């Protein structure tokens, strides 16, 4: 079997957006990609992110909030920043690491409907990537 590629989702606190992206990534990309997420800082997994993903039958209670791991970052096939802060302060990556920015609003501290909206937007974006490679 061919080695899987690695995708690394990054946001500021590895609390909401990147946690959701990791979960969606495992669902849509898991057969071809190793999927990880991390943050510039560690804020813990937001309970509303867990609740939002449970609504779509994806359990992220065992996911952890992690700081960027240089080993994963430097070996990833694709690094995806999910917020402008992570995009601007993300450590440099080697030239062979493809880095893209997919911006999503931060639902933390906002109404419940924002968690649902951002969850669905991230899921749709990753599904599209799984189908088109873009």
Swiss-Prot record:
Pfam families: LMWPc. GO terms for molecular function: arsenate reductase (thioredoxin) activity; protein tyrosine phosphatase activity. The active site is at 11 (nucleophile), 83 (nucleophile), 90 (nucleophile). It comes from the Bacteria. It catalyses: arsenate + [thioredoxin]-dithiol + H(+) = arsenite + [thioredoxin]-disulfide + H2O. One of its GO terms (biological process) is response to arsenic-containing substance. SMART domains: LMWPc. One of its GO terms (cellular component) is cytoplasm. CDD domains: LMWP_ArsC. Keywords: Arsenical resistance, Cytoplasm, Disulfide bond, Oxidoreductase, Redox-active center. Catalyzes the reduction of arsenate [As(V)] to arsenite [As(III)]. Belongs to the low molecular weight phosphotyrosine protein phosphatase family. Thioredoxin-coupled ArsC subfamily. PANTHER family: ARSENATE REDUCTASE (PTHR43428:SF1). This is Arsenate reductase. It comes from Bacillus cereus (strain ZK / E33L). The gene is arsC.
